[in-house]
Every structure is written in C-alpha cells, then in structure tokens.
Amino acid sequence: SSFGQDAASREVIVRACQKNDWFEPEEIVDAVRSIREEFLSRDKIEHWLACYERPATLPSRTVLVVMAGNIPLVGFFDLLCVVTAGHRCLVKMSSKDAVLMSFVIDQLKKIEPDIPVAVYDGTTPFDAVIATGSDNANRYFRSLYAGVKTLLRGNRHSVAVLNGRETSGQLEALSDDIFSYSGLGCRNVSLIFVPRGISLRFASRRMNPKYLNNYRQRKALREMCGDPFFDLGFALLIRQSEFQI
C-alpha cells in the first residue's frame, strides 16, 4: 500500500510530527511520494547513471553522511548517491528527522538485507564525509573532520525572477516553491525579482502553527518599527531595491 495509507506508516508519520513540530503529515507523504517517483523510478535511475562513466576498478569506501533535518527525508538523496556509487553509507541522522530516516533504513534492510547502509555509532571509522548544515555548522565540520575528504554544504537560498506575464498556474507553482515545508528547504524561494509596478497575490493556504507564530512576530515587529510591508494574511511581502543573502 502507499505510504500513509497503512497503520504502520501512519504511526510513523504521527511520531515524526511529534518529534519535529515543523513537519506536517501531508508534506511527509508528499516527500515520500517525490522520492519514490523522482529518485527510485527505474527509468530515471538508469537515465541518471547513464550520464556517468563508471571506472573499471572502483575501491569501495565508507562514507559518513551527516544529514540535515529541516525537511522530511532531506538526507535520502545523499544516501542513495553513496550506495549507488558502490560505497558503504554510514548515516548520522538529524534528531529532527530520525523517526522517518530510521523507518526508511529499516524498509531498505527488509528489501535488501545486504544493502551497505548503517546508522553511525560514533566509533566506526570512515574514509570521507558528506555533511549538510548551516554556515556555522560547516565551520564546526571543517574542524571536526579535518584531514578527511569532505563535501560540505552550508546555507543556500533560492530566488525567482518574474517578468509580469506569468499565468495563474505558474504563480500557484511559485507559491508551492515558496511556502511548502514552511519555507525551510534550501530550494524554497525566499527572494523574488519582479518588474516595477507588478503586485503579487497568492491564494491563502494553511500553514504550520510554528510558521504562523513567526509570521505574527515579524508582522508585529515591522508595525512597531514603522517598516512598510504587504500582508498576505499568512506571509509578508517586503519591497526592497537592494538585497542581501
């Protein structure tokens, strides 16, 4: 059955949301659906791998993957890449996403008991590290994993560039790019370039309670400071001629 439609996966969703109250049940289901359709489709995997020439001899290494937890199962693609490349993946889960990632690893083990994936116990040696976190976390990673081959990801921001001729469907898709997962993903749009004179309108949508608390606080702060903004009822649009990321 599809994830979220059986008792076991529904129980996992409930526990994941209890552990991280930024998570929403429907967004967890959507994240799993995206992984199944975009990452685990046989045709798409074969097309992806066809873009790379596999060396005749490829030494197997142990790669520690330090996962973020900002959105559901955000670290899965790193796990997939490590295993697909023929290496062993040690998973250091974020406490914010441990419920879902543990469930997925258990499912992988049931499908293929010999899959080279293990949860990091803090002592197992490794040859390389892939780590995702904030810029501050990256500085810590550089010190912690000095002398080890690393691939480190810090803060990321996504932007949208509009020309004023967007269709309602395109604006609806942009709304999803902005507000899905409460805007916490590195691919969530947080800066929009628009021509002068263009006013943006987005349909109202249900947002996470923690997000709404932040929205109300930011709105109250701007009102107290007299800073202009346009209120969508669930988000603030702030016009600026300069930007800083």
Show where each model-derived region lies.
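Glycine-rich nucleotide phosphate-binding loop and flanking beta-alpha elements
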Residues: 46, 71, 136-138, 200
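Donor nucleotide-activated moiety binding/catalytic core segment of transferases
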Residues: 49-67, 120-125, 135, 234-244
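Conserved small-residue-rich beta-alpha loop and adjacent elements
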Residues: 47-109
